[in-house]
């Protein structure tokens, strides 16, 4: 008679934003199946918040330059793509950036509405030269997985959409090793060296 054992899950915090799970025992062959399924689900199906686009007066596409800003719009968008945010509600929000040069504009200078927090405040957004100014609106939204810039378009011709990566999970890895519990079975060690970017806990 086949006797199935109920797997046990143990969790261990390995440091800031790092977690390890051990699931054992599993029937032979189940470790790879379960591990790959969990990995794909964590990387693609965990909801999060991301930048969907920006609005700067006088700028209507990404292949242009902004007077007084060292980076072009494309580089600025790539920098904002790495912005990590915590949002208390499920609403879309607009953040503002008002800065004057010379010097770097950091994510800490982004003005957020109540319930929105920038996690990586040391992120460099752009560099202003001389006494130039930057007045920019940054739109953020909730979502799952990856969204192309075309899906973030609005009716506003001055709005520049950006590809959005909503997943707060940065990396997932797993290993399967044999364990002895009466007979040879699988043990799934699911570990993520850098699983979260800080927007969830």
Q: In which residue ranges do the predicted regions lie?
A:
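Protein-protein interaction/assembly regions in multi-subunit complexes
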Residues: 1-192, 199-201
